[in-house]
Amino acid sequence: MGINLGHDGGAALVTPNTMIAIGEERLNRTRYSPGWQAAMLYCLRAAGMRLTDVDLVVVSNFGRFQATPAETGLAHLGIRDDRIRILDHYLSHAYTAYCLGPYDIATVLVTDGAGNNTDTETFYLASHSGIERLGGNDPGRGRHGGIGATYEAFTEHLGWHAQEAGKTMALASYGDPSAYLAPLFDVHDTRVYGRLEETHARGVAAFAAATGFDFGPVGSRGDDPRGVDAAAYLQSQVEQVLCSLVQAVISVTGVSDVCMAGGVALNCVANDKIRRLPGVSGLFVPPPASDRGQALGCALYGLHRLTGELPRRPIVTDSFGRSYTDEEIELALNRDPRSGLVERRFAPFTWHRESDVAACAAQMLASGRLIGWFQGGSELGPRALGNRSILADPRSTASRDALNDRIKHREVFRPFAPAVPEAEAARWFDVNGPSPFMLLAPAVLDAARSRIPGVVHVDGTARVQTVDPLVSPLFAALVEHFGALTGVPVVLNTSFNDHEPIVETPADALATFQAGELDALFLGDYLVEKI
């Protein structure tokens, strides 16, 4: 069992035959929530196990000092100290990056806001024999000079939560990166030296004062052109330093297949540039690359310690949650209190079992309707990939705008992602292989841009999800049906939420459906529509 004590808390259970994981926020419905108790119970129930069946509990935390077994709070559950291991935060990320990846031997790079000690960037050589740390940032340089902490600081300056770096990345495409010319980072050998001298927004203010730059007022949230240019400057500088760092660590390891993890590895724009670097043969980033994957990395480490063999679990899906039965879905549809349904807004609805949900959903999308799509087990990472999704027609900006105005209520500069059959992707996007986790942002091909404007960002890119029918047969069938109806085998895909964690249970999905303005909801084989 793996547990993350920090923000984005959660639990994971790994056995020789299965992996189950979930974030605490999906269960208590509080974004970025710490905690692990509900997540642990969820994992045990999904596996049909008791806590006494667990051989080892591995814990990581966020902070300068690692937790001790006594500080974990596990003793009150009857877990003795000799069944508890404490794992370094960055090593947990490294286990997630390598063990879930496709490469037998890999260079592993972890770039996060912070971990234990003063880590901000670390790199490893990973193979079947183990994961060996080869280097990292200068321990004498505080975390304020790290890539992740710098990105967090600018994100806070712009007025968002430090964990909302994706907003800064999206805003960056609207700005001019050359508006500010001083370098934000230097790389010496394999060490990064950032120019900020403090963390958080105050570090940006001090840097601006020292350089004479005007990044606009704190909290501009994209409404001030100086802040927009600041986002563009930051993103450009981060792309440059990451590319330099990847090439530097490859020169040390001698291995050109790269696995990356840590919150910075969710920067899909930078990832797309890294995969094109000379000397990079392959790039893998696990979908729960941020601290959402900490518990899973801990559990993988624990299995390694128990068996003596490094677990290799190459993934093709981010579905680490459990599926829900028809009986559980019907409890919610019947408003049974046992379903956990909390109706934020009462909206009468009708429901029935649909014989072909993929074809029915595709027909609705083709007619311009916005739908919720709830299937199988939930995704662990921050992106909905066809299990907990809201879907729309990408052929016009009208669906995109309606989605923002009526349901998502988010910043207009943030793009929506396209889902496309893997076999069709190269006809629409500048890709040369699968991109199943929305962790690359390639260019949309010129001939395709006018056909799918709802998913094209202002810079002509898109955060692509390729769909493999062998991995996600139902979602693939939906996209293929939509393509047959419209001639465009691309569907707009975004996470099923509205300023809340992604929905986990049928009751969560139904409550969000009632509270918002979705036209229809597909819960497994059931179609739900408002009266």
Predicted regions and their residues:
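Active-site cores of enzymes that catalyze phosphoryl transfer or operate on phosphate-rich substrates
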Residues: 175, 181-236
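Short HxH-centered metal-ligating active-site micro-motif
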Residues: 40-46, 55-63, 478, 486
